[in-house]
A protein has these predicted regions:
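Acetyl-CoA-dependent GNAT
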Residues: 4-11, 15-73, 78, 134
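Hydrophobic adenine-recognition pocket in adenosine-nucleotide-binding enzymes
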Residues: 5, 80-82, 115, 131
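Alpha-helical interaction/dimerization surfaces of two-component signaling modules
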Residues: 16-20, 102, 125, 129
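Short coil/turn motifs at secondary-structure junctions
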Residues: 65-68, 82-85, 118-120, 145
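Short coil/turn segments at alpha/beta junctions that flank glycine-rich nucleotide-binding fingerprints
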Residues: 73, 89, 105-109
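Conserved acetyl-CoA-binding loop-helix of GNAT-fold acetyltransferases
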Residues: 79-82, 88-101, 128
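Conserved active-site alpha-helix within GNAT-family acetyltransferase domains
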Residues: 93, 105, 117-136, 142
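Conserved GNAT acetyl-CoA-binding A-motif
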Residues: 96, 103-115
Length: 145
């Protein structure tokens, strides 16, 4: 079942981010972010795939409203993760379909996402579900003290 993320999901989301994406974060950080994202008009959306039998979260997708001066409104997928042991079962596809439903309901004209250049399997997945890898970019980051 796909549903909106809840603060009670924070520990499972933290573990999922670590195992599927290699990101480490504290339980407090994940819980705080979920609380912020679930506030009205936050512009963030996060859905989880919860296994019916066990209640275990097997995947999640996170998106935000993307608006700029030069484009129509869209959605930006910030993260999609499925536990490695649950990959290949259609969970990622279902989560992305939920984002597509959201985009249609919000009259978004596109969905965009970035995927690290070394994540070749992810690229194949996105292309298989209809996304076009049409741009190569270099990301610049400045850590603020």
């Amino acid at each position: 079942m796909i549903r909106s993320v809840q603060v009670e999901d924070a520990a499972q989301i933290r573990d999922l981010c670590h195992q599927a994406l290699g990101y480490d974060s504290s339980l407090e950080k994940v819980a705080t972010q979920i609380e912020k994202f679930n506030m009205p008009d936050s512009g963030h959306f996060c859905f989880v795939y919860e296994e019916d039998q066990s209640g275990k979260i097997l995947g999640y997708v996170e998106a935000e409203v993307y608006e700029s001066l030069y484009s129509d409104p869209g959605l930006n997928v910030l993260g999609l993760a499925v536990f490695p042991s649950a990959q290949g079962r259609g969970i990622g596809r279902q989560l992305m379909e939920r984002v597509e439903e959201l985009a249609k309901s919000r009259h978004s004209t596109f969905i965009r996402l970035n995927s690290a250049s070394h994540r070749k399997e992810a690229h194949v997945f996105y292309e298989r579900i209809g996304y076009d890898g049409n741009k190569t970019q270099k990301r610049f980051l400045k850590i603020m003290d």
